[in-house]
From Swiss-Prot:
CDD domains per record: TM_PBP2
Role played: Part of the ABC transporter complex MalEFGK involved in maltose/maltodextrin import. Probably responsible for the translocation of the substrate across the membrane.
Protein name: Maltose/maltodextrin transport system permease protein MalF
Broad class of the protein's primary localization: membrane
Similarity comment: family membership: Belongs to the binding-protein-dependent transport system permease family. MalFG subfamily.
Domain of life where this protein originates: Bacteria
Gene: malF
Organism: Klebsiella aerogenes
Quaternary organization: The complex is composed of two ATP-binding proteins (MalK), two transmembrane proteins (MalG and MalF) and a solute-binding protein (MalE).
Length: 514
């Protein structure tokens, strides 16, 4: 009799399709929320990934893709999606002054108002658990009083002329300040149907819209009469002269527009950006090359020493030399920042006692760069040492025995046997180390923050900045505003450079492009 394989209740098709249906509803709800809030890219990305995932995990024909999909989805979400967004931003003027859409920027300008008409002194009187608003005309001395009301939301209060103000102590400035948000939502309607709103902590006054919008999109300042027109080239409402030409005045906030290759051309044409960019690029390459050379050299020499058979206590030395690799890098960097302190650091105290010198590690460009390379060598040599220790085990002892018979010494063995045999397998790892240090943001940010700063530059730039930290400072530390578009353009250039390094790495390891 054939054994019938029983299925558990959680393996039933009805439950499976019910769960899939609930997930579809949840994803649809999230996509609608994102779309309603204007997050169109996130909505599209969520819809695509979720739809593909539901299809793969609910269709038996796509069973093999279940093992690949999580990796592909992660790459798409965390690599391709940010990359596409960064490249897209690079072709816009997106910045701290141009963050809004045109419609939103226009609405912000239309919501602005200015004081027009009489100003009335106001007082707030308690009426049980409610309040009464009293306005006083400073010119005529007339008083106007509202009915009792409670704070909460936008309200229109009808005021009537009163012979005298309510008895009792009126609210002090502290109470008014605490309820300022609620008072700003009140509109007081006087007996002549004129409306006034809170204009200061002591006054209500009539207001009018600052700008009037025409059918052609032109804004007119109701106070000065100046006309403004949207300039799609710069993303601002800009004043226009009598002859129709552009004036010098711009209205903030601006709005985001596509500006083509302008951010990229700024990198190569604006001297305030071009000079620091190329100087920082050269320093980034030099820093990466020196770091790789020094870490490999120190790591290889130490690996040879701890592998020396005549050395006693090799295990202890190995542990001690690998310790810098075990300590989190950000902790080591901050410790070195204290050690290199120009006034109280132990390194300067020692150099002063021995040689009578106190290098300016953080204010002189040359010594600051030297300090960066020293610290990065300390952080990177244990990794190279571990690699070399493993590779040394693969070198046959027969080679050293044959060289000893020929009368070769330790230095000849190192340069004629050890170094050539280690460099070849280390080459792809050295290229990977170069690419990593090309974007070593943490070291620069924690140790020097890019300083000392360069003078006469359009964008914030320092002598120890790498391209990645330079991009970060443009995006988030710009004194004249955060220029995300320019930062995205530089980030795109960095991506192309790192991509070129990846191709070099592939060619160096003789991998074929399938």
């Amino acid at each position: 009799m054939d054994a019938v394989k029983k299925k558990h209740w959680w393996q039933s098709p009805q439950l499976t399709w019910s769960v899939i249906g609930l997930l579809c509803l949840l994803v649809g709800y999230l996509v609608v929320l994102m779309y309603a809030q204007g997050e169109y890219l996130f909505a599209i990305m969520t819809l695509i990934l979720s739809s593909v995932g539901l299809y793969i995990f609910s269709n038996r024909k796509a069973y093999a893709w279940r093992y690949v999909y999580p990796g592909l989805a992660g790459m798409g979400l965390f690599v391709l999606f940010p990359l596409i967004c960064t490249i897209a931003i690079a072709f816009t003027n997106y910045s701290s002054t141009n963050q809004l859409t045109f419609e939103r920027a226009q609405q912000v300008l239309m919501d602005r108002s200015f004081q027009a008409g009489k100003a009335y002194n106001f007082s707030l009187y308690p009426a049980g658990d409610e309040w009464q608003l009293a306005l006083t005309d400073g010119e005529s001395g007339k008083n106007y009083l509202s009915e009792a009301f409670k704070f909460g939301g936008e309200q229109k209060l009808a005021l009537k002329e009163a012979d005298a103000l309510p008895q009792g102590e009126r609210a002090n400035l502290r109470v008014i300040t605490q309820n300022r948000a609620a008072l700003n939502q009140l509109t007081a309607v006087l007996p002549d149907e004129s409306k006034v709103i809170m204009s200061s902590l002591r006054q209500f006054s009539g207001t009018q819209p600052l700008y009037a919008l025409a059918n052609d999109g032109t804004l007119t300042n109701n106070q000065s009469g100046v006309k403004y027109r949207p300039n799609a080239d710069i993303g601002f409402y800009q004043s226009i002269n009598a002859d129709g030409s552009w004036g010098n005045e711009k209205l903030s906030p601006g709005y985001t527009v596509t500006i083509g290759w302008d951010n990229f051309t700024r990198v190569f044409q604006d001297e305030g950006i071009q000079k620091p960019f190329f100087a920082i690029f050269v320093w980034t390459v030099v820093f990466s090359v020196l770091t790789v050379i020094l870490t490999v050299a120190v790591g290889m020499v130490l690996a040879c020493l701890v592998q020396w058979e005549a050395l006693k206590g090799k295990a202890i030395y190995r542990v001690l030399l690998i310790l810098p690799y075990a300590v989190p890098s950000f902790i080591s960097i901050l410790i070195f920042k204290g050690l290199f302190n120009q006034s109280f650091g132990e390194i300067n105290m020692m150099l002063s006692a021995l040689f009578g010198i106190k290098p300016a590690w953080f204010s002189d460009p040359t010594t600051a760069r030297t300090m960066i390379i020293i610290v990065n060598t300390w952080l990177g040599y244990p990794y190279m040492m571990i690699l070399c220790m493993g590779l040394l085990k693969a070198i046959p002892d027969d080679l050293y025995e044959a060289s000893a018979m020929d009368g070769a010494g330790p230095f000849q063995n190192f340069f004629k046997i050890t170094l050539p045999l280690l460099i070849k397998p280390l080459t792809p790892l050295m290229i990977a180390s170069f690419a990593f240090n090309f974007n070593n943001f943490v070291l620069i940010q924690l140790l020097t923050n890019g300083g000392p700063d360069r003078l006469g530059t359009t964008t914030p730039a320092g002598y120890t900045d790498l391209l990645v930290s330079y991009t970060y400072r443009i995006a988030f530390e710009g004194g004249g505003g955060q220029d995300f578009g320019l930062a995205a353009a530089i980030a795109t250039l960095i991506f192309l450079l790192v991509g070129a390094l990846a191709i070099v790495n592939l060619k160096a390891t003789r991998m074929k492009f399938d």
